[in-house]
C-alpha cells in the first residue's frame, strides 16, 4: 500500500488520523467489516518502549485496521491483563463501539501543553514503536500519543 503524502500534517497542522472502535472479539468484528467491503489488516498485538531504544514490552491490547484511502478505522481490544488492557476493558464495560478519535500533528509536546492550558487533563505522552510490513519491506513506525 502506498502512503498518501497528504496524510501527514505539515508543521502547525492537525489532521484527523483515525477512529478507534473498542471490541471484545477481533475476528468477529474484522470479519463483519470485511463482509462490508473493508480491507482489514491482520491482527497485531501492541507493544511499546518506555523510552526510545528500550526493548518493546506488550501493552495487553491489539488491533485490526480497516484501511481507507486516507486514514483507517482501528478495531481495538484487550489481549492480556495489563494497565492499558484494564483501561480498555473499563471503556468496553460502558459500551462497545467508538471510543477513540485520533489526530495527527507534528509537535506532541506543544499539543499536550495546549490541551493542559485549555483546562483539560491530558494523560502523559505515550510513545509507541513497532515494525510494519509494507510493499517496500519492513519499516519502523514510531508515534507519540497525547
Regions found by a protein language model. Give the residues of each.
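N-terminal ordered "arm"
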Residues: 10, 14-50, 67
Amino acid at each position: 500500500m502506498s502512503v498518501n503524502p497528504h496524510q501527514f500534517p505539515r508543521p502547525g497542522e492537525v489532521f484527523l488520523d483515525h477512529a478507534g472502535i473498542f471490541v471484545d472479539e477481533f475476528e468477529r468484528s474484522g470479519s463483519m467489516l470485511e463482509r462490508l467491503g473493508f480491507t482489514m489488516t491482520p491482527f497485531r498485538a501492541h507493544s511499546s518502549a518506555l523510552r526510545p531504544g528500550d526493548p518493546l514490552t506488550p501493552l495487553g491490547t491489539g488491533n485490526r485496521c480497516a484501511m481507507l484511502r486516507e486514514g483507517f478505522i482501528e478495531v481495538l481490544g484487550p489481549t492480556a491483563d495489563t494497565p492499558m488492557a484494564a483501561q480498555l476493558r473499563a471503556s468496553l464495560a460502558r459500551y462497545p463501539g467508538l471510543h477513540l478519535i485520533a489526530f495527527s500533528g507534528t509537535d506532541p509536546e506543544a499539543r499536550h501543553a495546549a490541551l493542559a492550558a485549555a483546562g483539560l487533563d491530558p494523560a502523559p505522552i505515550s510513545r509507541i514503536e513497532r515494525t510494519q510490513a509494507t510493499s517496500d519491506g519492513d519499516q519502523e513506525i514510531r508515534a507519540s500519543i497525547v
